[in-house]
Design a protein with these regions (language model features):
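Amphipathic alpha-helices that form helix-helix packing interfaces
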Residues: 78-88, 92, 98, 102-112
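Short, Lys/Arg-enriched N-terminal segment that forms or immediately precedes the first helix
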Residues: 3-15
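Short amphipathic alpha helix immediately N-terminal
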Residues: 21-32
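Residues within the DNA-recognition helix of helix-turn-helix
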Residues: 54-57
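C-terminal flanking helix
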Residues: 59-66
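Helix-turn-helix DNA-binding motif, specifically the short coil turn and the N-cap/start of the second
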Residues: 47-48
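Hydrophobic positions on the alpha-helical face of helix-turn-helix-like DNA-binding modules
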Residues: 40-41, 51
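Helix-turn-helix DNA-binding elements, focusing on the entry/boundary residues of the two helices
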Residues: 37
Length: 113
């Protein structure tokens, strides 16, 4: 359950702007603010079942976007490769100038993504 929450939060960060304002707000209330279905229902004026349905449909929409676009997966891959590059750099016998330039480049790549 915890992993699913993290994944949905991650997808919400990437694709949240694609969702309607209402769907995004409900997901943020549920996952980020840790509100119950009843609390969300009271706040936005629909039934608990309506909130649950909206959350499920929004989750499906986020998962579909990731399946088709793969932006989160690509982002994670780039982050991992940048980390591996820096780790390999620390273990190598490269001059300080080269090491600093590569670190600067890796940091700029991270900042860009």
């Amino acid at each position: 359950m915890f992993e699913k929450n993290l994944e949905i939060n991650y997808l919400l960060d990437f694709y949240g702007d694609v969702l309607s304002e209402r769907k995004r707000t409900v997901l943020e209330m549920y996952y980020n603010d840790d509100l119950s279905l009843a609390e969300i229902a009271l706040d936005i004026g629909i039934s608990r079942q309506g909130v649950r349905d909206m959350i499920k449909k929004s989750e499906e929409e986020l998962l579909y976007l990731e399946e088709k676009l793969g932006l989160c997966k690509k982002f994670r891959t780039i982050q991992k490769k940048a980390d591996e590059l820096l780790e390999a750099l620390e273990d190598s016998h490269v001059s300080t100038d080269v090491r600093d330039k590569v670190k600067e480049f890796a940091d700029s790549v991270r900042a860009t993504i």
